[in-house]
Structures are given as structure tokens and as C-alpha cells.
């Protein structure tokens, strides 16, 4: 299969490198420095005591105009429209898009470029750390869950086979929107709070005052999810967040790293979308609105 990885950060490089063992993979990025480094040095993946190197043919966004079978989207979800518009040459009527991005409403954006039945959404427990351009260390392994945006299970199974063949533990969900909601509870709490308090993930549970904020945001988000047709048990949601803090809490969230490095975050696709849904259902979401405004305020100070 011919695959284009759009966005060559840690996750794009990791997934692309693994898939390149059995597929033809090209890498697309918006930064010339990244493109030059990948072409010259390839990709290095570190997993435990094992280090592997991969060739990485890379192109500047908009410069690769051959259609592909699959686009793997690893830019920030707030950059989807710009990235895909720049790279429209990748698409034909059969091209599949896989997005493992955080946030809501991604399928609506992708459907501007491919048919909804060609869109696979998902979530992954895999977490990688970028040590340098094209040098990636696996921090946490885990399951990747895929699902069709329009209940095209055959397509989701195709994605599962593709990833499984390259060593990814992959499952298919019949209700990917519920999976996205489950992932959202973690992202709308731990991401902004670690960024605001400049702390590791584990501190969100260890510090009782931050944990009180986690509970407030999570409970409010559960109420919005119910209005959207999805019911969740608050105790189970908080247990999920607590377990992540305890078991995977030594690292830093993506939003913390974005703020630290003065990059724009995905806050509008996370808490911002919760606020939008609340507005849609004529409900207030003051906790989500507070962290949305707080992170946006920090971004304006860069």
C-alpha cells in the first residue's frame, strides 16, 4: 500500500517507520528543516534497549502531488484544513484517511477532501517522545482503536489488518464516537491542567486542589456527553483519569509541551468543542470555558 504520513512529529515518524516495513511510505511536513533532516538521516526509533533506523523519503507540504492509497494524519487537529488543502494532490476517489487525533468534529473536516465512507477515526494508547528531528523514543505502548465515521466496518477492518501487519495491537470499535468521548475525558482535564500548572501528569492526582479541578471539569463534560446521547458513569471516568495519573504520570502531556515551547495548542478542539456543544444544547460549561480561556490567554502572551 502507498501511504503518505502528513505531519512528521514523534507519532507520525513512529507509525510511518513501522508501516514502512511492509508498505511504501512517504513523509509530508510543513517545515523544510524537518524534510531535509528526514531525507538525510532517516528515522531512528528507540524501543527499550532496541534501536532501529529507517529510510524516510520526505517532501515539503504541497510538493508531493501523486495520489496515495492511505493518508495518515498526524498534524494537530487545529491544522487539518490547512494541511489537507496544501496536500490535495494526495487524494483520489479511493484514498483512505486515518486520523488518530484528539478532538471532536474531525470527520466533518476530513469529508471536505474524501468521501465519509473513506474516513477512519481512532484513538491510540501509544505515546512517543521526540528526542530530535526523526529520532523518536517509545514512551508507552498500547492498543490502537479504529472505527468508521459512517459505520463502514469493512473499511475499519482494513485499517486493523494494515496496522496489525506492522506490529500494532489494533481493535475495531462499532461505536467510535463513544471511544472519542472516553478519550476526551482525559484530554479535557489532564492536558489543560498540566499546561496551566506546569506539572507532570501524576501531579494532577497527587495535588488535591488540582484533582478537585479534574473532578469539576470531568463531571461537567459527562453532563454535556449525556446531552449528546452518550451516558458515562462519573466514578468510572474518574477512575480512568486517576489510573493514567498513577500508571503513566511521569511524563508530560502534549499541551504542557506545547505551552512550554510556545506553540499553539489543541484547546479549541478539546475544551472549546465541549463549550460549543454546551451552547448547542443551551447548557453552561463554566469549567471548560475557564480552561479554554486560560490556555488561549497564555497563547496570546507568546
Named regions from a protein language model:
Residues 89-90, 113-118, 133-183, 188-189, ...:
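Internal alpha-helical scaffold of NAD(P)-dependent oxidoreductase catalytic cores
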Residues 1-51:
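NAD(P)+-binding Rossmann beta1-loop-alpha1 motif at the extreme N-terminus of oxidoreductases
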Residues 3, 24-26, 116-119, 170:
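Hydrophobic anchor at the start of a short beta-strand
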Residues 32-33, 78-79, 104-105, 154, ...:
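Short alpha-helical
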Residues 164, 215-302:
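NAD(P)-dependent Rossmann-like dehydrogenase/reductase catalytic/cofactor-binding core
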Residues 17-21, 85-89, 112, 272, ...:
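Short, well-ordered alpha-helices that flank and scaffold nucleotide-derived cofactor binding pockets
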Residues 50-135:
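Rossmann-like NAD(P)(H) cofactor-binding subdomain of soluble oxidoreductases
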Residues 1, 69, 142:
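Nucleotide donor/acceptor-binding cores
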Amino acid at each position: 500500500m502507498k501511504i503518505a504520513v502528513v505531519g512528521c512529529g514523534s507519532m507520525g515518524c513512529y507509525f510511518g517507520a513501522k508501516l514502512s516495513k511492509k508498505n511504501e511510505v512517504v513523509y509530508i511536513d510543513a517545515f523544510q528543516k524537518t524534510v531535509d533532516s528526514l531525507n538525510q538521516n532517516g528515522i531512528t526509533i528507540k524501543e527499550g534497549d532496541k534501536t532501529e533506523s529507517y529510510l524516510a523519503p520526505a517532501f515539503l507540504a504541497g510538493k508531493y502531488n501523486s495520489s496515495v492509497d492511505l493518508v495518515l494524519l498526524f498534524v494537530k487537529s487545529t491544522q487539518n484544513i490547512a494541511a489537507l488543502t496544501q496536500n490535495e494532490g494526495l487524494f483520489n476517489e479511493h484514498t483512505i484517511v486515518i486520523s488518530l487525533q484528539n478532538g471532536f468534529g474531525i470527520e466533518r473536516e476530513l469529508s471536505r477532501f474524501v468521501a465519509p465512507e473513506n474516513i477512519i477515526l481512532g484513538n491510540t494508547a501509544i505515546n512517543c517522545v521526540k528526542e530530535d528531528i526523526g529520532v523518536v523514543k517509545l514512551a508507552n505502548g498500547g492498543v490502537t482503536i479504529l472505527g468508521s465515521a459512517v459505520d463502514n466496518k469493512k473499511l475499519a477492518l482494513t485499517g486493523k489488518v494494515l496496522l496489525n501487519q506492522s506490529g500494532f495491537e489494533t481493535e475495531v470499535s462499532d461505536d467510535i464516537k463513544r471511544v472519542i468521548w472516553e478519550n476526551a475525558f482525559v484530554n479535557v482535564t489532564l492536558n489543560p491542567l498540566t499546561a496551566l500548572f506546569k506539572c507532570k501528569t501524576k501531579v494532577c492526582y497527587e495535588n488535591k486542589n488540582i484533582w478537585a479541578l479534574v473532578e469539576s471539569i470531568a463531571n461537567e463534560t459527562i453532563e454535556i456527553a449525556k446531552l449528546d446521547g452518550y451516558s458515562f458513569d462519573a466514578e468510572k471516568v474518574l477512575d480512568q483519569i486517576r489510573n493514567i495519573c498513577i500508571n503513566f504520570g511521569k511524563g508530560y502531556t502534549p499541551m504542557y509541551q506545547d505551552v512550554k515551547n510556545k506553540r499553539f495548542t489543541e484547546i479549541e478542539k478539546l475544551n472549546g468543542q465541549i463549550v460549543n456543544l454546551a451552547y448547542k444544547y443551551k447548557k453552561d460549561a463554566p469549567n471548560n470555558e475557564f480552561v479554554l480561556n486560560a490556555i488561549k490567554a497564555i497563547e496570546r502572551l507568546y
